[in-house]
Amino acid sequence: ANSDSQEDQEVKLKVKEAVVDYIRPVLSESDSLSESRAILESESDNIRNVAIKTLRDNGFMEDVSVYFEKSYFPVKSYGDVTFPAGYYEAFRVDIGEAEGKNWWCVLYPPLCFVDAVYGVVPEDSKEKLAGVLTDEEYKTVTDRGCKVRFKYLTFINELLGL
């Protein structure tokens, strides 16, 4: 987003929705990370135009840049699949100054299309994911038995007998 103002964040979500709606049918047929990358490269001008049109339709005049880069991402969950924080290849759609909070999704398989209501990653997407990750990486992102605890809170709970 251009900034963290409420207006910029709201239009960012509209741009995200328009871009996802545009690219969903094309990326859903991708069989590999390299194919997804090639699709996005060939569609980059169209993706930029979709983003610009959405901005203009909503009264915004910012420019849009689209490009690939390695970017740091926080922990991200898609239903029962969780990706650890780290550096990932990203296809960026920058609006204006690009100084606001961002939205992101996994490039391949295209997990941005996961059912947000039910939070379920389809089995075919999990199979594709297993095909591009090592066994250890796949176990890391799909293991739901992991528990996160904070030592300080554990100590306080023990102290209070909770």
Annotated model-derived regions:
Residues 26, 54, 94, 155, ...:
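Residues that form generic nucleotide/phosphate-binding pockets
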